[in-house]
């Protein structure tokens, strides 16, 4: 299930001129992702919540723009999941399936900040900071930070500057 909410409103002069305030949230909840429990198994398993496959992800934020300037603050969240799996048993007998096991990977959250300006004929400039709160990527059950680099950003706090000039 995906849910996208967006609310925009005009705001009065806040000392910098009249502007526009935008609140948004993008939410994804994966209910099922079925596949074979393991190669050769006829048993199907819902993979959501297993290692590296969180069930939910969402982003929410606020944008404020006025005149030729804007500022944006975004919180990015990735849900939790279990570290490992083990064979499924029923009355002591293997069923050909797997179940979640091991510890639980915590939810992960970071903040991004972006400021921008349209300078007319001089172009557009943007300054931003990814992972503003400098949250480390979450390690796997053995303490390895490189395991989930496709899921978490392992760069740490990163600032950037962009100047776009069209001619």
Where does each model-flagged region fall?
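Outer-envelope beta-barrel architecture signal
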Residues: 15-21, 56-58, 67-69, 109-111, ...
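Gram-negative outer-membrane beta-barrel transporters
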Residues: 1-87
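Short sequence motifs at beta-strands and strand-loop junctions characteristic
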Residues: 50-55, 105-109, 153-155
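Extracellular loop and loop/strand-boundary signature of outer-membrane beta-barrel proteins
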Residues: 43-49, 90-93, 97-103, 146-151
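C-terminal beta-signal and adjacent terminal beta-strands/loops
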Residues: 31-34, 77-91, 116-167
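Generic long, charged, amphipathic alpha-helical segments
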Residues: 75-76, 84-111
């Amino acid at each position: 299930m995906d849910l996208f909410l967006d609310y925009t409103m005009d705001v009065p002069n806040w000392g910098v001129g009249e502007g526009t305030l935008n609140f948004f949230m993008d939410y994804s909840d994966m209910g099922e992702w079925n596949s074979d429990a393991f190669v050769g198994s006829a048993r199907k398993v819902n993979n959501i919540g297993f290692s590296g496959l969180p069930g939910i992800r969402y982003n929410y934020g606020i944008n404020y723009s006025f005149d030729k300037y804007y500022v944006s603050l975004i919180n990015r969240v990735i849900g939790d999941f279990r570290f490992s799996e083990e064979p499924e048993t029923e009355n002591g007998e293997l069923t050909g399936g797997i179940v979640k096991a091991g510890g639980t990977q915590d939810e992960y959250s970071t903040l991004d900040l972006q400021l921008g300006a349209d300078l007319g004929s001089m172009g557009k400039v943007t300054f931003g900071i990814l992972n503003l709160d400098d949250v480390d990527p979450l390690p796997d059950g053995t303490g390895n930070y490189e395991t989930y680099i496709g899921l978490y950003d392992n760069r740490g706090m990163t600032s950037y500057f962009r100047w776009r000039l069209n001619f």
